[in-house]
Amino acid sequence: MGTLSVNQNKLQKRLRRLAGEAITDYNMIEDGDKVMVCLSGGKDSYTMLDVLLHLQKVAPIKFEIVAVNMDQKQPGFPEHVLPAYLKELGVEYHIVEKDTYSVVKELVPEGKTTCSLCSRLRRGTLYTFADEIGATKMALGHHRDDIVETFFLNMFFNGSLKGMPPKLRADDGRNVVIRPLAYCSEKDIQAYSDMKEFPIIPCNLCGSQENLQRQVVKDMLVEWERKHPGRTESIFRALQNVAPSQLADRNLFDFTSLKIDESATPRFLDVLNI
């Protein structure tokens, strides 16, 4: 790339700043960490790697970066693209080969969405590999819009009020997942990916499934944002500002024990002035 334009420079600085803020706010990366950056070949993971490589140079702490891609043996997967890109960058990398494609095609009926099973199989394989190489953090490329979409997916279709946290410890306690792009918008990431001309690898397994529930939610949020700019950011801020006493989850707040506080100062009305 040549010299960046003013707007391109602003975009790059904004993504780096927001990623840095998210990393700091959630203590995502600590001194001595070995960060396994999960690369899918999509715009989000390329942007995440690009931003993390910059932050590695300027951060006051030292941490390692290891890029990992999972070759799921999808037909037509361009095996050469990521190794060539990572070699040019001079980044340590691993390609994990696991034929989850055949498993998904065998278990999921034709016409049904494959995302859930594919994601579980991929996540399990990557968790195991992170453990094998001694990675202390596992970085995923989910962004702010992904987090908000997941919140609505769980609310609309699962009846639960949960999203996708910026930092998560796996159930077995062996892996810590971080999402450095948690504060970044998909719009900015797409613009940055276009600007950098990353060698995008399309997902042939699920990319054509246009009737996904996530796409329905995404379309809804896009329409909201079009009519009311800033709404997505406001929803994300709400996820950071939860008041359990104002919801209805008895496991989060002890509603059953609520009683009048007899020691509280009484309030009296001046009846004559009503």
From Swiss-Prot:
Highest taxon listed in the record's lineage: Bacteria
In its keyword annotation, does this UniProt entry include Transferase? yes
Q: What Pfam families does the annotation carry?
A: ATP_bind_3 (PF01171)
Q: Name one GO biological process term.
A: tRNA thio-modification
EC assignment: the record states 2.8.1.-
- Pathway(s) of this molecule: tRNA modification
In its keyword annotation, does this UniProt entry include ATP-binding?
A: yes
Q: Explain how, and how many, cofactor molecules are bound.
A: Binds 1 [4Fe-4S] cluster per subunit. The cluster is chelated by three Cys residues, the fourth Fe has a free coordination site that may bind a sulfur atom transferred from the persulfide of IscS.
Q: Which GO terms describe its cellular component?
A: cytoplasm
Q: What class of enzyme is it?
A: transferase
Keyword list, A-Z = 4Fe-4S, ATP-binding, Cytoplasm, Iron, Iron-sulfur, Magnesium, Metal-binding, Nucleotide-binding, RNA-binding, Transferase, tRNA processing, tRNA-binding
Question: Which InterPro entries does the record cross-reference, listed alphabetically?
Answer: Rossmann-like_a/b/a_fold, TilS/TtcA_N, tRNA_Cyd_32_2_STrfase, tRNA_thiolation_TtcA_Ctu1
Q: Which NCBIfam families match?
A: PRK10696.1 (NF007972)
Q: What else is known?
A: The thiolation reaction likely consists of two steps: a first activation step by ATP to form an adenylated intermediate of the target base of tRNA, and a second nucleophilic substitution step of the sulfur (S) atom supplied by the hydrosulfide attached to the Fe-S cluster.
What role does it play? Catalyzes the ATP-dependent 2-thiolation of cytidine in position 32 of tRNA, to form 2-thiocytidine (s(2)C32). The sulfur atoms are provided by the cysteine/cysteine desulfurase (IscS) system.
Q: To which protein family does this belong?
A: Belongs to the TtcA family.
What's the name of the protein? Answer: tRNA-cytidine(32) 2-sulfurtransferase
Recorded source organism is: Pseudomonas putida (strain W619)
The encoding gene is: ttcA
